Amino acid sequence: MSEVKDRALRALQLMDLTTLNDDDTDAKVIALCHQAKSPAGNTAAICIYPRFIPLARKTLREQGTPEIRIATVTNFPHGNDDSEIALAETRAAIAYGADEVDVVFPYRALMAGNEAIGFELVKACKQACREANVLLKVIIESGELKEASLIRKASEIAIDAGADFIKTSTGKVAVNATPEVAEIMLRTIAAKGVQKQVGFKPAGGVRSADDAALYLKLADNILGPDWADARHFRFGASSLLASLLNAAGFNGATSDSNY
């Protein structure tokens, strides 16, 4: 197998195939489920708004891929600082049947100097997720934090509060995942010695097989070549799938999103 194809297949199996658009419909979510069962293998998960979870669960089961996980979003996309609302949304997502919850960290509170709000919000959501055996990913919105020190601090707080993954971005702001931010976040995981428990998810702007290969190379270099499995690494993306299928020698799939 060629190295290019090998890398593409590896990345495909680490995708959270995503649609988080205001105009999402049942038909679009069903199409996303079909795309997640690709000719080159299944993506790790799909990521959708909570209200579509029951439909997605039914579709994945009927197409013979119940193992594809369902991720959703809470406190999304603005990262407000009300822990009660974030917790209520997270509990509702769990009740809908989510396997994984991607919660937005209250990044503006951190930028204003308040570290406690983020810790308490993530801790509360983690407790709800732990009780339901649901994975918690924390979106720090790195493109808004901008400064390396804030990106590192948000990552540390999320990890200390129990995050199973730290995730770069919502995909709803001007700057989303970048290799520079990925390196900071991956090195934070390494520095805290939590690579067994905590994973990393770049999201937004990861569109090509070459992009994906660059992020995986970073993970391999910083945390070891065997670290980036589906429990420790995901890509939040939609248009990436077509590029990966093309690189792997399959006809490209289409996507309505540019996430």
UniProtKB/Swiss-Prot annotation:
Q: Where in the cell is it found?
A: Cytoplasm
- EC number from the UniProt entry: 4.1.2.4
Q: Which reaction does it catalyse?
A: 2-deoxy-D-ribose 5-phosphate = D-glyceraldehyde 3-phosphate + acetaldehyde
Enzyme class, broadest EC rank: lyase
Q: Which GO terms describe its molecular function?
A: deoxyribose-phosphate aldolase activity
Q: Does the keyword Lyase apply?
A: yes
Q: Which GO terms describe its cellular component?
A: cytoplasm
**Major place of localization?**
cytoplasm
Q: Does the keyword Translocase apply?
A: no
Q: Which domain of life is it from?
A: Bacteria
Pathway(s)? Carbohydrate degradation; 2-deoxy-D-ribose 1-phosphate degradation; D-glyceraldehyde 3-phosphate and acetaldehyde from 2-deoxy-alpha-D-ribose 1-phosphate: step 2/2
Q: Which residues participate directly in catalysis? A: D102 (proton donor/acceptor), K167 (schiff-base intermediate with acetaldehyde), K201 (proton donor/acceptor)
Alphabetical list of SMART domains matching this protein: DeoC (SM01133)
What function does the entry list? Catalyzes a reversible aldol reaction between acetaldehyde and D-glyceraldehyde 3-phosphate to generate 2-deoxy-D-ribose 5-phosphate.
| Alphabetized PANTHER family for the sequence | DEOXYRIBOSE-PHOSPHATE ALDOLASE (PTHR10889:SF3)
Q: What's the protein here called?
A: Deoxyribose-phosphate aldolase
Q: Which organism is it from?
A: Erwinia tasmaniensis (strain DSM 17950 / CFBP 7177 / CIP 109463 / NCPPB 4357 / Et1/99)
Gene symbol here is deoC
